[in-house]
C-alpha cells in the first residue's frame, strides 16, 4: 500500500469532515467562498493548500485547526468529545 503524502491526508480529512456534514463539494465550496475546482484538487491531494486556506476550510467545517489535524491521518488519536469541548489553541 502506498503511503499517503501530506496533501493527500489533508484532502482526505476535508472529505471526511465535509461528508459528515452531508455537504456536497459544490455547496461547501460556495459556503466558504472557494472555487469548487480548487477544493476538488485539494481533496484528491493534487494541490498544496496554504495554512490560511486550511484554516478557512476548518472554520467552514465547524472545527478548530487542532481538531482538523487531530486525526489518525496525521498520526494522532482523535480527541474525545469532552477533550474537544475544552480544547484551546
Located regions from the model:
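Residue-level signal for the short linker/turn that defines the boundary of a DNA-recognition helix
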Residues: 12, 22-23, 49-52
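A short, Lys/Arg-rich alpha-helix, primarily the initiator
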Residues: 1-20
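Short alpha-helical DNA-recognition segment
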Residues: 22-44
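Residues within the helices of the helix-turn-helix
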Residues: 15, 26, 55
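DNA-binding alpha-helical recognition surfaces that contact promoter or target DNA
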Residues: 12, 16, 30, 41, ...
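DNA major-groove recognition helix of helix-turn-helix/homeodomain DNA-binding modules
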Residues: 33, 52-67
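Alpha-helical residues within the helix-turn-helix
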Residues: 19, 30, 59
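Short, charged recognition helix plus adjacent turn
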Residues: 59, 69-89
Amino acid at each position: 500500500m502506498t503511503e499517503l503524502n501530506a496533501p493527500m491526508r489533508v484532502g482526505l480529512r476535508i472529505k471526511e469532515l465535509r461528508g459528515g456534514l452531508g455537504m456536497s463539494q459544490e455547496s461547501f465550496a460556495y459556503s466558504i467562498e472557494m472555487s469548487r475546482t480548487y477544493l476538488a484538487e485539494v481533496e484528491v491531494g493534487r494541490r498544496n493548500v496554504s495554512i490560511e486556506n486550511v484554516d478557512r476550510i476548518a472554520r467552514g467545517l465547524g472545527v478548530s485547526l487542532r481538531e482538523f489535524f487531530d486525526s489518525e491521518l496525521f498520526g494522532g488519536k482523535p480527541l474525545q468529545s469532552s477533550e474537544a469541548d475544552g480544547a484551546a489553541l
